[in-house]
């Protein structure tokens, strides 16, 4: 018996038998998910808080465009964008030394005391507390002291004053916030009033944190504290006199005295009057 091969012809060139059935089943599954409420919901875009419906709430500019600006050759010479972000206050005050002056003071004192930076940190702590108690007057001299447990250690005050430009008080204003926090810490343990406040007879214990002469008044200083600090400063400066010139020690008599005196004269500045002596 001769075996003959059967030849099968397909209508399409792609063999996808049964694939249409799988696609139909998958389509029914998706339809079922939509009907069961599991369809993916596309959210609407967020609505800006400044809008209500189709109306937009206007925003005001920080600086109006109608300002009279410094002009040269018809062009403004100020940058308003930079000015809006430039909000420095403390470091611009003439009441405190500049960063360069403070650095020069620090380096000069460290060189004069022949100390390392780690030791200088301890020295500055002690000097700040000493200034809280004794002030930063330019008339102070001698030594300043620091306690090591029960031992009192003295340091010459001259390097602190010599390197302080423009003044020691302006240098110490860099320590104003730290000194205020130190007084507040001491007051939590027990009532503490700096010597500056005791001399001015400050009786309100809550104002002790402002009772030192290098306190830096800022915009956040309470009105009552500001008044108390200025009153203490006025009391400290009430009887102080500042003389521009001292006594000139180079004083000589440039006039020659040619007056002749005898033993019968009444006194050194008066001759006798026909033998009559004054009473």
UniProtKB/Swiss-Prot annotation:
Reaction(s) the record says it catalyses: RNA(n) + a ribonucleoside 5'-triphosphate = RNA(n+1) + diphosphate
Record EC number: 2.7.7.48
Taxonomic superkingdom: Viruses
Keywords assigned: Capsid protein, Nucleotidyltransferase, RNA-directed RNA polymerase, Transferase, Virion
EC supergroup of this enzyme: transferase
Family of the protein in this entry: Belongs to the potyviridae genome polyprotein family.
Protein name: Genome polyprotein
């Amino acid at each position: 018996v001769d075996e003959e091969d059967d030849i099968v012809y397909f209508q399409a060139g792609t063999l996808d038998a049964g694939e249409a059935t799988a696609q139909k089943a998958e389509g029914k599954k998706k339809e079922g998910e939509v009907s069961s409420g599991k369809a993916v919901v596309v959210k609407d875009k967020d609505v800006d808080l400044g809008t209500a419906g189709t109306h937009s709430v206007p925003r005001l500019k920080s600086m109006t465009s109608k300002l009279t600006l410094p002009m040269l050759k018809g062009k403004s010479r100020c940058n308003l964008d930079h000015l809006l972000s430039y909000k420095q206050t403390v470091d611009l005050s003439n009441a405190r030394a500049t960063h360069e002056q403070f650095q020069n003071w620090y380096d000069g004192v460290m060189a004069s005391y022949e100390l390392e930076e780690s030791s200088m940190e301890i020295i500055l702590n002690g000097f700040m507390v000493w200034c809280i108690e004794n002030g930063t007057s330019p008339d102070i001299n001698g030594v300043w002291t620091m306690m090591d447990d029960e031992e009192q250690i003295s340091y010459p005050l001259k390097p602190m004053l010599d390197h302080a430009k423009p003044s020691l008080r302006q240098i110490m204003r860099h320590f104003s916030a730290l000194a205020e926090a130190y007084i507040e810490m001491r007051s939590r343990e027990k009532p503490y009033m700096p010597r500056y406040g005791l001399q001015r007879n400050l009786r309100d214990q809550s104002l002790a944190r402002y009772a030192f002469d290098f306190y830096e008044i800022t915009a956040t200083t309470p009105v009552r504290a500001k008044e108390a600090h200025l009153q203490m400063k006025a009391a400290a400066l009430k009887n102080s006199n500042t003389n521009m010139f001292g006594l000139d020690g180079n004083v000589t008599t440039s006039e020659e005295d040619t007056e002749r005196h005898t033993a019968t004269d009444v006194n050194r500045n008066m001759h006798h009057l026909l033998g009559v002596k004054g009473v």
